[in-house]
């Protein structure tokens, strides 16, 4: 019994998600660094407002700098989670149709969450 490695390599190359592993690795690291930097802001914000009333905290969140950093934090964290979930799904789900469906569902969920967050931030009274 000789295992046909060429057939497996061809099958892997023809997969829709086997484009560039190094690009995916780099994106995972870059989003991780951005999240680490944003977490410093979040920790600072929490400690400086720990004794404040909820109205003061909401007023602080409505400042443009804080809105931008919060949007970056949520967007990058969801994108980082999409990258991680994609790797897990590709590694552990063997059925190609189920794999592709789950990846699309995860992406749609994260897009819907980001859009909902943006709407909630900009349309809160």
From Swiss-Prot:
Pathway the protein acts in: Carbohydrate metabolism; tricarboxylic acid cycle
Keyword Transferase: no
Any single GO CC term annotated in Swiss-Prot or TrEMBL for this entry: plasma membrane
Keyword line: Cell inner membrane, Cell membrane, Electron transport, Heme, Iron, Membrane, Metal-binding, Transmembrane, Transmembrane helix, Transport, Tricarboxylic acid cycle
Pfam families reported in the protein's UniProt record: Sdh_cyt (PF01127)
Cytoplasmic side: 1-24, 90-99
The keyword Electron transport appears for this protein: yes
Record GO terms (molecular function): electron transfer activity; heme binding; metal ion binding
BP GO terms, sorted: cytochrome complex assembly; tricarboxylic acid cycle
The protein's name: Succinate dehydrogenase hydrophobic membrane anchor subunit
Gene: sdhD
